[in-house]
Amino acid sequence: MGDKIFHNLSSKTLVATPHVITKGIYHKSLIYMLSHTEEGAIGLIFNRLVNHIDLKSFFKIKNDDITTPVMVPIYLGGPVEHEKGFFLHSSDYNKNLLLDFQNDLAVSSNLEISEDIAFGKGPKNSLFIVGYTAWKPGQLEEELERNLWLVMDCNKEFIFADNPEDKWHSALKHLGIDEIYFSAQIGNA
């Protein structure tokens, strides 16, 4: 057998296949891939809304100019390190970026962006995500071979759409797939 060809999925979106991942955090999840190398992969689930938080109290922003709560949705990015928070956001905001992508998206993980969002000076679009998803070397490739994920190009309007519950169905529709045509037995051609 020959060597497997590695396809970098950084900046792509993974779409959980129906009836294969049937429960848990990955059921009907969408994951924006932050990094994918031969050493492993890291991504953020962006459609698993868990709550809303007040940025001012959550980040202990001390400023009397903000008199009302600044409520933002909080998403669960995956099962790893829930104490870590990330802002997946549009690239119009470029202060102290953790990651900057070519598809008009960026990731920040610092207090400054939360303050800027609270003051209305942050990015046009953003999601606050806690935790992340990670794969060991070869693990994601194995899951792709087992048809646990579909891969699609990233679309920032899709990521920042208002209704997180509809994003997975919208992703299937974008791929030209109707969920009812999936069976529990799917395979590679």
Swiss-Prot record:
GO terms for cellular component: cytosol. SUPFAM superfamilies: VC0467-like. It comes from the Bacteria. InterPro entries: AlgH-like (IPR003774). Coiled coil: none annotated. Disulfide bonds: none annotated. Pfam families: DUF179. Belongs to the UPF0301 (AlgH) family. This is UPF0301 protein A1C_00165. It comes from Rickettsia akari (strain Hartford). The lineage of its organism: Bacteria, Pseudomonadati, Pseudomonadota, Alphaproteobacteria, Rickettsiales.
